Amino acid sequence: MIRSKISTALLFAAFVLLLGPVQLWAATSNPVTVTDLNGQARNFFPDKNSREKLVVFIFVLPDCPICNSYVPELKRIRKSFPQTEFYRVYADPDLTAAEARQHSKEYDFGFPGLLDPDQQLVRKSGATRTPEAAVFSSDGRLLYRGRIDDRYVDFGKKRDQPQHRDLEKALMSILKNKAARWPDQPPIGCFIPTKKNSGS
């Protein structure tokens, strides 16, 4: 009897172990729908079976000077990876489309902008500051999150040239089917405001 109970327990544990990754896979592959600056819906991570295409989200705030200073570098990186999709995500949930479009006119990033009023992409990536990058596979796996480079040492203090180009190196590694190295330090930048509850 005891041996039978042990066997049943082992079988159940094996079943849980097999089921676990399936549940995790489903959780990480949930589709995300946001809108671009023209009000058009954009769907991400719809294909759970495709791992070929990379999607890079750069989280920005219009009034963050560090974000705006990275425009030339981000345009350079974008041109270096023409097969990769780049988007800037306006992370402030209260930002209007008109405000985002105005910022887009003043700072030409060279790739599309997205509104994230419900902070779906913020939560999915775990981004906390701007500018911060998140790299996903097209099936919704987070492959990298962190700074663009280490140009900024602190607020108001930066190097002429970065010592580590973290985002660029991460993309190169991923495209070679290698794991990307995540920075030990969070990006220097502006904190992403959290969405307020409607009842507060």
Model-derived segments and their meaning:
Residues A9-P21:
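Bacterial N-terminal signal peptides
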Residues L24-A26:
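Boundary at the C-terminal end of the N-terminal hydrophobic targeting segment
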Residues V32-V55:
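A short beta-strand-turn-helix
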Residues K48-N68, L171:
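Short active-site neighborhood of thiol/selenol oxidoreductases, capturing the structured segment around
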Residues L61-V71, P93-D94, A133, C190-P193, ...:
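Short, thiol/selenol-centered motifs that function as redox-active sites or metal-ligating centers
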Residues N68-Y107, L115-K124:
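Structural microenvironment flanking redox-active thiols in thiol-disulfide oxidoreductases
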Residues H103-R145:
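Short, internal strand/loop/helix patches
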Residues S137-S138, L142-S200:
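Thiol-/selenol-based redox modules, centered on thioredoxin-like
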